[in-house]
């Protein structure tokens, strides 16, 4: 075993780890029912745009048998009713590069927000002792035309500054950490 190669592989795996999602990983370690993933046979369309993935907090806004059927469908699919469900377009994922796939999954994971206090510490539920989660919106949501006419607000300016830096995760590091690439 080449130690420098092994050390390099460990470094690359660490580079893919995102501490922003530690609150999810910790819950999954103790409770696999927190999150489930599903494949869709095609993209969805919303607001005239293709939707390749969607994260949703699982809620049944039905009563009686409708709710019971929906819960049973989840149990049939996953063996449990998850708190959050991420659905991705299988057709897109099949042809996506490793980078595109990882980015899609990470984007959807960012929608699982964790409540924090004014010091940035995670807020825990008094009843369950678990972190309080919510379905998070996007950090920056603005129209190109709006920025052209009125300029960039603080969130857009921050995004521009961040985008000037090289990404933390390179294509090479993704391939080195991909189970299919490493095993195959």
Task: For every predicted segment, state its role.
Residues 1-7, 11:
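Single conserved hydrophobic/aromatic residue that forms the stacking wall/gate
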Residues 10-14, 106, 145:
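Hydrophobic transmembrane signal anchors and adjacent membrane-proximal interface regions, especially
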Residues 15-35, 39-87, 91-95, 115-184:
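Metalloprotease/metallohydrolase-associated module, dominated by Zn2+-dependent proteases
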Residues 98:
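…; additionally, a secondary subgroup of soluble metalloenzymes is captured
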Residues 103-115:
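Active-site recognition of the HExxH zinc-binding catalytic motif
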């Amino acid at each position: 075993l080449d130690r420098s190669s092994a050390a390099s592989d460990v470094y690359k795996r660490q580079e893919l780890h995102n501490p922003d999602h530690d609150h999810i990983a910790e819950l999954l370690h103790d409770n696999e029912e927190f999150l489930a993933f599903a494949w869709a046979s095609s993209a969805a369309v919303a607001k005239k745009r293709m939707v390749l993935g969607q994260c949703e907090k699982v809620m049944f806004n039905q009563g009686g048998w409708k709710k019971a059927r929906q819960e049973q469908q989840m149990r049939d699919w996953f063996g449990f009713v998850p708190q959050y469900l991420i659905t991705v377009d299988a057709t897109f994922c099949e042809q996506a590069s490793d980078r595109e796939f990882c980015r899609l999954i990470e984007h959807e994971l960012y929608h699982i927000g964790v409540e924090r206090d004014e010091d940035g510490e995670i807020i825990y539920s008094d009843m369950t002792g678990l972190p309080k989660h919510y379905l998070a919106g996007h950090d920056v949501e603005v129209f190109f035309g709006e920025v052209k006419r009125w300029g960039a607000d603080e969130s857009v300016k921050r995004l521009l500054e961040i985008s000037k830096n090289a990404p933390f995760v390179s294509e090479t590091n993704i391939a080195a950490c991909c189970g299919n690439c490493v095993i195959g």
